[in-house]
């Protein structure tokens, strides 16, 4: 309960002149963008954590096994954050509290590590050495200013492994430029669109972690939801799938096993309309990700090819067509997203899955 909620003189808007109040919507937009960014990054890490855990079980047992996903050693999935500003701190806190990442598997490189005392008390290692962070981490989040990014890329590009995933929040630097700066293709960059006529649902008096535990706010962050006026470009979701394929390819896993594994992991949350017969639910097929001509010549034992994630997010892919033409697949992914944060959708909470741009 917020004891200051009804005290008008203590509200942010109180000191804003009447003629400037038309700009107050930007405050809600900024807050909503922060919440969405942290939510989508956390969802991504949850998926990758579960995927790597399942791959570890598969390699140790020499057969496909996806039970008890969280039994793998959590230290095997390492996350690094470059930038200790507001976004970097909020992201670290969200991953630690709502994600599967323990403190010892999360590190931050920032020019002023002494300002991150609260995070260090939680066990997160904070220091200033970008190259060391990149050589250690499996996923690297770029939470820096656009002006800082070129120098950071010079520092880190030689430390990137082929399988390292770079996740950039630096909206001002387009993907082709970032690919060139890093000499790297395994890059994800979410893009957001704004609806100026929307009503803010972002809960002005809640922190990011508390906001993502509110069912209304969490559902507003769903990839296909326009609620709150911030819409995620669905090319990001395609990039997430192809990033998962690259992880499996790095393990030299047969594509037939990969499809079975990803179907189990990504399409495992069913909704009421599925009923007891889940056999009719979507399953991932080879031609969902590669052309029919390529798939025809790919033997069952061969892994998927290595995908350029920057190209996936900039061009049409087989999965673009499959995803846009399958509302059932969209609904399954929406339910998976909400379930990953502990929220179950009901008939009173409809899935919104059509009519949004995917450019």
Curated annotation (Swiss-Prot):
Alphabetical keyword list: Oxidoreductase
The protein's name: NADP-dependent oxidoreductase domain-containing protein 1
Function of the molecule = Probable oxidoreductase.
Similarity remark: Belongs to the pyrroline-5-carboxylate reductase family.
Say which species the protein is native to.
Homo sapiens (Human)
Instruction: Tell me the enzyme class.
Output: oxidoreductase
Mention one GO molecular function.
pyrroline-5-carboxylate reductase activity
Enzyme Commission code(s) on record: 1.-.-.-
What's one GO BP annotation on this UniProt entry? Answer: L-proline biosynthetic process
